[in-house]
C-alpha cells in the first residue's frame, strides 16, 4: 500500500483528520469552511461508472477498486463541481473543507464544490457519474453509518476570540442575576438517531462542560418524536416525512426520548427547571435544562397526554409541529392540509396555558401561528428561525408578519445559526438586528438548534457564547439589549407561562 507524502500541507490535513478523536484540533478548526488543497486516492462508490461527481478521497491507496474504507477518519467525502474520471494515480483536489455532524452516511469531513488541480496531462470528464443522492438511496450509506456514526466530542468556534488589544467593542458582561438561555437545543445528542442501527443506543455527549465554558446557564432540551418516520431529503436541504407512523409508535418513541433526557440529566448533573422560582435560581445551580419536546406528534390526538408529559416527564416547553403534518396543524416544509392550527391544536394550546407549559410555534405555517396567537392566553415563542423578506417555498424562515404575530402575544422569536442563512457569527448578529428592527429587542432570543442541523451551523458549541455576545455588541446592541436577547426575554415568557 502506498501513502501520499508529496505535499506537506496535504499530509498535515490528513494527520489532523486521523487525530480527530484527540482534541484540541486547532488546525482543522481553523480550516473549517475554508478552501484547501488535498491529495489522495479517488475511491468511486460505483467502480463501473466512467466518472463521478461524488466519491471518497482516501489518504492511502485502496487494496482494490471496489474497496470502500469503513473508517471515517481515513477518508473524506467529496462533492465535485464537475464529474472527474478515476485512475490508478492519486489526485489533487481544491475545495471547501467542512466538518460534519451525524452525517447520514457516517462521514466526518467533506470537501465541497471541489475542483481537480491538474498535476499531469489530462482533464476532467463531463460524463455523469454516481451522485451522492444515488448512493444514499442505494442503502449503502446505512451500512457505513452503522460502522461509524457521525459524532463529535465537541465543536469549536469559527470566530476568533476577541483580542484585548484590538479595538473591538467591550466584551459582554452579564449583570448580576441575568440568565443566558438557549430556547431550542438537542445538546448531548439527546434525540434517538435516525440510523436504525443506533437508534436509542446513540452515545450521549458532554453538555455541562461546554455550557460552563461559555457561560450558558439554561437550555431548553428538546426531544423529537418523529425521527422514526422522517429522514434527510435526497437533496440534503431538509428533513421530510417518508412514511406514516403505526398507532402508538410515536408515543412509544417519546417514552424512549424522555428516558434519554433523564439519563443525560443524571449523567451530566444538570438541574431540571420546572417553575419560575427554579428558573430564578438557575444562575446559582450550575447548568440547567427545561425539558422540551419538538413536535407534539407523541400526543397522537390524545389531549390527556399533555398532562402526562407535564407530570411524569417534567415537560415545560412544547413545540406543536415538526417535520410531519400532524394532528395539531400544518408545517412550513410541506403543503398545507388543515388550513393552519386544527381544533385539536387549539385544545393543546389552551391546556398548555392552564398547566404552565410554554407553547412553541416553530415549524408552523403562518396560518397556524396566527390562530395560535388568537387562542393563547400566554406569550408564544417561535424558538428557532430567521427573518426573510420573501421566504422560498417550504422555507423554514419567516416573514415579518409571522414574527409580529408572535411578538403581539408578548412572545419571543429565536434567531438560529443556520449556515444556510448566516455565514458567520457576525452575520448572525445582523440577523438579530433585522429581527429586532421588525419586532423590537424585547421579542428576540437565541435558539441554537444544537445538533439539529444537516450541515454544521455557525454556532456549534456553547463555548462560542462570548463570541456571539461580542458580535451582538459589534452590531450595535447595548449590554442590556444583549442580555435581553441571550436569555432575559425567554425568561419573561417562561415566567408568564408558568404563573
Residue spans for each PLM region:
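Short acidic/polar capping segments at secondary-structure boundaries
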Residues: 97-98, 116-117, 294-297, 322-325, ...
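OB-fold and OB-like single-stranded nucleic-acid-recognition modules
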Residues: 1-129, 152-165, 422
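Active-site core of metal-dependent hydrolases
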Residues: 321-401, 414-421
